[in-house]
């Protein structure tokens, strides 16, 4: 049973890593791409020594990584909306509730 969990966790970590690197490549400036790529590699390397059976820590780190990835992708969506000419007020309405709490960018950008 635990070997299946270990294998699945490895798959999830690798998938998250690839999606993070892909998101970094979406940064408009090469310098920002390289900075984000370095940050991603550093974060993953710093957690490489976590024991593969420390399921709770791995789960928490995966959640953290997914949240950071969502933030990066939200930034890309906002940038795309801004470039497409969408007004700033509607962009902000997509990202914040009435109390100005961040809720993320939910609508998809049409290309």
Swiss-Prot record:
Subcellular location: Mitochondrion matrix
Alphabetic keyword roster: Chaperone, Mitochondrion
PANTHER family: LYR MOTIF-CONTAINING PROTEIN 2 (PTHR13675), SUCCINATE DEHYDROGENASE ASSEMBLY FACTOR 1B, MITOCHONDRIAL (PTHR13675:SF5)
Keyword Repeat assigned: no
Gene Ontology annotations of biological process type: mitochondrial respiratory chain complex II assembly
One Pfam match: Complex1_LYR
Lineage of producing organism: Eukaryota, Amoebozoa, Evosea, Eumycetozoa, Dictyostelia
InterPro entries reported in the protein's UniProt record: Complex1_LYR_dom (IPR008011), Complex1_LYR_SDHAF1_LYRM8 (IPR045295)
Name of protein: Succinate dehydrogenase assembly factor 1B, mitochondrial
Quaternary structure (record): Interacts with the iron-sulfur protein subunit within the SDH catalytic dimer.
Superkingdom of source: Eukaryota
